[in-house]
Amino acid sequence: MENSEDISLNSSEKSIESSVVNLEDQQQSQQQTQQQTCQKTFVQEAPELTILIDKLIQLKHSNKDELISNTTRIIYIIDQYLEQPTLLDIHLNDIIQPLINFIKSNYINNSNNNNTTTTTTTIMTETEIVIKKLSIKNSFRIIYVLSKVRGFKTIVKLFQHEAIDLLPVLDQLEISYHQWVNINKQRDRLNEISVSYSSGINLKNYIKPEEESEQEVVDENNNNINNNHNIDDEYNENIISWEEVYVLALWVSLLVIIPFKFSSLDSASSGTASAAGDGGDGDGDGQLKSISSRILKLGKLALSDVSKIRDSFSELLSKLLNRPDMKFEQKQFIKWCTNSIQLISNNNNNNNQNNSSNNNILLIIGIYSTLATMFKKGNRLDFLPIDMNLYEKIMEANKYLSLSGSERITKKIFLKLLQRIAIIMLPPVSASWRYQKIIKPLLLKGELIKQINNNNNNNNNENNNEEGEEEEEEIPEEIDEILEEIMKSLKDKDTIIRWTSAKAIGRIVNLLPKDMGDQVIGLVIDQMFEKNEFIDADPSAWHGGCLALAELARRGLLLPERLDVVVPLVIRALFFDIIKGTYSIGSHVRDSACYLCWALARTYHNSILSPYLLPICRNLVVVSLYDREINCRKSASAAFQEMVGRHQGLVPNGIEIVTSADFFTVGNKNNSFTSLTTFIGKFQIDYYPIVIKHLATIKIYNWDLEIRQLASKSIHLLTNINPNDIVSNYLPLIIPNTQSDLVHVKHGASLAISEILISLFENNNINLLSDNLKMMILMTIKNTKNEKLFKGKGGVLIRIGMCKIIYSICLVEFSLDKNLSEIKKPTESTSTNGNEDRAAALKLKIAMLKAKTASQINKPIITPPSSKSTTNNNNNNNNNNLNDNEIAFNIILGYLNENLNHPNEEVQKEASKAFELLFSKYISSNEKISLLLELIDSHCKTLKFDINRSARRGSSLLLGSLPFNSANLSYDLLSKVVNELILSIFQDDPKFKDIETRVNSISSLYKIGIYILNLIFKNQENEQKEEEDFKKSKNYNLFIKIWNCLGLATNDYSIDKRGDIGSWVRELSCKVLFDFIKFIITNQNSSTTTTTASTTDLSIENLINEKMITEFICKLFQLSGEKLDKIRDVACKIIHELLWIENPSSINNIPHKEELKKIIVKDQDVHFNWFRTEESLPLICKVLKFNCYLYPLLFGLFSSLGGTSKYLINDSIQSIKQYFSSFDNDEKERFEKIISFSKAILEITNNTTQRMIQPTFRSIYNLLSTHIFDFLIINNLNEQSIFETILFNCYQIIESNQDDIYLLLNSIELFSYFFIQFENNNNEYIKDYSLKALLLLLSNLKYPKVRKLASDQLKKSTRLFINNNGDDETPSLIKSLIFNTKWDDSVDLIIEPLKSLLLLLNQKHLLELLSENPTKKPIPLAPPITSIEELKDKIQNPHKQSDDNNNNNNGELINNNTENNNNNNFDDNLPEDSQDLMEI
C-alpha cells in the first residue's frame, strides 16, 4: 500500500512538473500576443503564487515583516486579474483548498477545543505564535480578495462542505462576530471621548458615574486596540478582521444547505419550532439554542453592519430560510422585516433624527438584500399569497431612502426587491407570445421558413386568445405601480440603477401577456429615445433604453415586427455624441447600442434579421474603427463578430474583416485609423461608402484634436483607393466648412482638404481637380484671413490648418496668378462695390499705420512689392494696388509672413514648410526672384534688429527654408544669411538672447550646410580642382565656418525657469555635425564610383581633418559624462555610430579608434540603455585611460560628480573606482593614471568657469573621499605639488567669491578634508592653506551659517590645540575662543573673538581683509591690542569693560544690532545670477 502511495505521489509530482513545463511553454507561446494586445492570456505568476501560498500555510516565515511582505505580494498578484478574473479559474482550487484546510486545522478545531497554543506537542515561541495567528488572519484576507476578484458565488463552491463542519464553523463565527462588534464599540467609545476632550468638554461630566471606574480599564486594556487600528489594523494578529467574519459567514451559507436535518447534527435543533416561537431567536430560559435560531439571531444583528459582513449574512439568511424545514421561520422573518421597515419609517415621519439614522439605512439595505435573494432562490409557492403589508411598507420606505443620501445603493437593492415581488405576483410561465428562434433545416429556403414562422405565430395567437384574456384578468394592480417605478429608474443618473432597471424590465415583461408586454415595449421606445442624439437628447434615457431593449431582445420579447422601429434607433445610438464644451457625453450610450446589436444577433434567425443585417454590420464596422473610446471600439467589434458568426454568409466579407479587425487590433487607435482603414476601404461596394461618409461628415469635425488629425489621415488613405469619389462627392462638401463659425469644424475641414490634395499629388491624380474646386480652395485662404475668429480664440488651429492647405496647394502647383477679387460668390451682387471700396480703403489705412509704427521702432515691415507701391503712389492708383494685393500669390505670401511672426512654434514651423515649397515651385519669374531677395534682406534685418522674439524665431526658420537650388543665390547673399544666423546663436544682449531662435538657427544652418556640401561635390565633379584649390574655395570656407559655429554651440549651458534649456542647443548641434559627417561619407562613396579621373579625393579626411574630428569626439565624450540622461544617450549613440559606421569608407582619423571599438562594441546587450547610469558610466569611464579624452571626459563627469542627485554621484564614484581598480595588477601604470588624472583635475581648476565652480568643489571632495589620491599628498613626491596647486586655486576662488553662499557652503567640506585628513602630515603647505581657507570662511561677516559650519570643522582639529612652541596658554586660548563663541550670532558679538583668534593664529592677511571689508554700519570697537599679553588678559577677563563705554554706546549698539539683524537677512543676500540658483 505504501509503495502504491509512493508511486502515486511520484506520478502526481511528475504530472505537476509536466503541467509546469506545459504552462511555461504556453507562457512563451503567448508572450508575444500578450505584449501586443496589452491583455493577459494566462496567470503568469501562478508558480510564484503556489510557492507563496505553500509558504504561508506551512508557517515558514521567519518574522512578521516577511509574512506581511509575502501576503502583500499575493494580494497584488490576484488584484491584477480584476478585469479578467476567469483566468484564475484553473488555479482557484489549488489556492483555496490549502487555505481552507489550514484554517480548519489550525483555527476552527483548535478554537472549539480551547487549545489554540497548548495542545501542540511542541512548545511554540512567542514569535511562532504571532506568525501563526497572523498567517490565519492573512488566509482569511486572501480568500476575501479572491471573492472580490472572481465573485463569492464561484469561491464559496470550493469550500469544504462536510456536514460535520457546520457546528465548529458556526461556533467560530459567533465568537468572531461578537469580538468584532465589541472591538468596534470600544473604538467608537474611545473616539467619542477623544473628540470631546479635544472640544474642551469636561470628561467627568461626559462619562457616566458607572463608567468612571471602567474608564481606566478601557484605556489600559483597549488603548492598544484603538492605536493599532489607527496605525495598521490589518497586520495586528490580536485584532479580529472583518474579512474573517465575512469568509466564515459564506462558509456557513454553504454548510446550511446540506440535505440533512439540523437535529441530526445538534440535539438542540430537535425543537426548532418551539425554540423559534418568539421570532426564531430561541431566548427561552434554560432552553438550548438551535442551529437555526443561532444563525437567525446573529444574522439580524449583522444586517445593519457597515462592512461587507452584511452581504455575507444576507446570503446566509436567504439560504437558511429557503430550506424545506424552515417554513415557519421564513414567515416569522418576513414579519420581522415588515415591522422593522415600518418602525424605521415611523421614526423618520416623526422627525426623530438621531445618531441611529445611518444604522437604520444600513438595516433597510440588509433587509432588502436578504428578501430579494430569498425571493430569488426560494420556491414561489412558499411566498404566496404575497404579504401586501410588506409591499406597502417597502413603497413607503422608498421615500425615506431617497432623502437619506445613500440613494444609489438603496435604490439598486430596492429595484431588485421590487422585481422579485413582481415575479412572485405574476404567473410563473414564460410568455407564450415571445419570439423563439427555430433551427433552420438544411434543405429549407428562407421564404419557406418565414411562412412557417408566420403560420406558427397565427396559430399561437388564435389558440391563446382566451388564455391571454384570463392572464390579463389575473395581473395584479401593483404590477403597474412597479413598472412605473422601474421605467423612471431607466432614466436615472447612475449606471448601476439603469442596468438593474433594464434587467427588471426584461424579467417582468417575460411574464406578462402580449398586450401588456407590447405596451411596456412601446413605452420604452417612445419615452427613452426622445430628441436629437447630437444636440439635446438625454444620455441617461438613451442608455437605459438601449439596455432595456437588449434585455428584451435576449429573451425574445422584442417581436420581429418591432425591428423596423428598433434598428434605426440602434443605428442612431451607435453615433450618440453630445458636445459639452471641451468634452462630450455619449460613450456609454454607444457601448449599450453595441450590446443591443449583439443581443439582436444572438436572438433572431437569419430570415428575420437579414433585411437589417447589412446596415447594422456596416455601422458596427464604422464604430469599431473610428470611435474615440477603446471600449466602444471593442464592443462594436465583438457585436460584429457575433453577427458574422450567427449569420454566416449574410455578412459580406465578414470572415475577412473579423480576422483582421478583431477585438484586440481595434484597441490601438492609430492602427484603426490607418492600416485597418486601408483594409476596409478595399471593399468598395459594401463598406467604403459608409466609411468615407462617416469620416467626411462626422469624424473630421470631432471636438477632439487627435481624432480630427487621425480622420484626415484616414481620408488620405481612402483617397488613394477611390480619388474620383472623394473629389466629386465629398471635397465640394468639405470646402465650405472652412468658413464655419466653429473652430473644430474649420480646423477639421482644413486638415481634410490638405490630406486630399497630398493624396492626389502622390498618385498623379491632380487632373481630377476642376478649376472651380481650385478657386474654391484658394478662396478659403482669402476668406479665412479676413475673419475675426482667425485672430481670436482657436486662431492657432485655424492658422495651422490654413498653412497645411497652402503647403498642399503648392505641392499640386495651383495657378497663383489669378486675381481673387474678380471671383464673386454665387449670392453676391454688384451692389457691394461700395462696401469693397470702403474695405479696401480701411486696409490701406491699416497698412500705412503699420508702416509708420514700424519706422518709429526701427522695425522692418515685410510687404510684397505691390503693397510698397501702394504706399508710395498717389491716391489715384490705390485701386490698382489693391487689386494687386488680391492676387493669390500675394495673399498667400502675406498670410505666411504673418504666421511666421506668430508666437506659436507649430504655426511658425508649418508656415516655414509652406514658404519653402512656395518659392521652390513659384520662383521662376524675375519678379518673384527679386521678391525673394527682398524677403531675405528683410528677414535678415528682423533677425538682427527686431526685439520681438516671435519675429526673430520665424525669420531664423525662414532663412533655412529658402529655395537654394532653384534660386541660384550668390555666395555673398548666402554668406550674409549664414553670418546672421551665426550671430543670432551667440547673442549676448538679453533682449535678443532667445533659446528658440538659437534652435531654429541651427536647423537652418543644417539645411544651408547640406546645400553647400552639395555644391562642393558638384563643383569638384565638374571642375576636378586640385586639393589646394579645393581647400581655398569660398564654399569650403563657408562650410568650415558653419562647422566651427556648431562646435561652439555645444558649449551652450543657458538656464531659465524651464531648466537647462541650453541642452536643446547642445543636442541639436551634435546631431547636425554628425549628419554632416554621414552626408559626406555617403556622397564620397557615390562620387568615387562615378568619377574615377578626379585629381582630388573628396574623402572625409580631406573635408573634415583629424583636428576637427578629434575635437568633435572629445566634445561628445564630455557630453556623455554630464548629468542629463538624454544628452548622454544622444552623445553615446553618435560615438557608437561613428565607430561602427556601415559605409564602405569609414572614419580613420579618430584617435584610438580600435581601442574604443573594444570598449563600445558593435552589438550591445538588448537591454543595455545609455540612460541608466549604472550601466553606461562604467563603460564611459574606461575611456579615461586615453590622454586625449581624459580632460574633456573628466570635465563632463564633474557635472555628474558634483551634482545634487545622490544616485548619479554614487554611480559616478563607483565607475571611477572601477576604472582605477582595473590597474591593480600593474602598480606603475596605476600610478601613471592617477598622476594624469590629478593633472586633469588641476587643469579643470585652472580653467573652471563660473557655471562649474560649485560642481568642481563638490567633485574634488567626492574624489578625495575615495582616498585614491591620498598617497600623493602623504608621501614626499614631486607630484604632491599638484594638489597643493589645486588647494591654492580653490582658495583663490572662494576669496574672490565671498558673496556666493552656495559656493562657500560647498567649499567647507573640501577644505575641512584637507585640514582634518592631513593635519598630522608633514606637508605644511596643505595644512596652512586649508587652515587659512577655513579661517577665511569663519571671517565671513555676511552669512552666519557659513561661520557656524566652518567653526564646526575647526573644532574637529587636534593640531590647533597642541602646544608646539612651548607656550602653554596659546592653544587653550584658541580652544576657548573656538568652542565658547557662538559663531552664528550677530557680527558685533563675534567680531572681537574673531580678531583675537586671527591674531593668535598669526593670520594678519585675514585681519587686513576684515578691516578692508567692514560691516554696513561701523561697529564701535575697543582700542587696538598691541601685544599678546594684552590679548591673553582680555580673553581671560572678557567682562572687563569700560562702564563709560557701555553707557555711552548702549543705545547706539541696540540700534546697530537691530539694523544689522535686518540687513543680514538671508534672502536679501542671495546671488542675483539665476544660474547659481539653478545649479543648487
UniProtKB/Swiss-Prot annotation:
Positions of transmembrane segments: none
UniProt-listed Pfam families: TFCD_C (PF12612)
Listed Acidic residues bias regions: 464-476, 1469-1480
Record GO terms (molecular function): beta-tubulin binding; GTPase activator activity
Record's keyword terms, sorted: Chaperone, Repeat
Annotated spans, Disordered: 1-32, 453-476, 859-880, 1437-1480
Keyword Chaperone: yes
Protein name: Tubulin-specific chaperone D
Species this chain originates from: Dictyostelium discoideum
Gene it is expressed from: tbcd
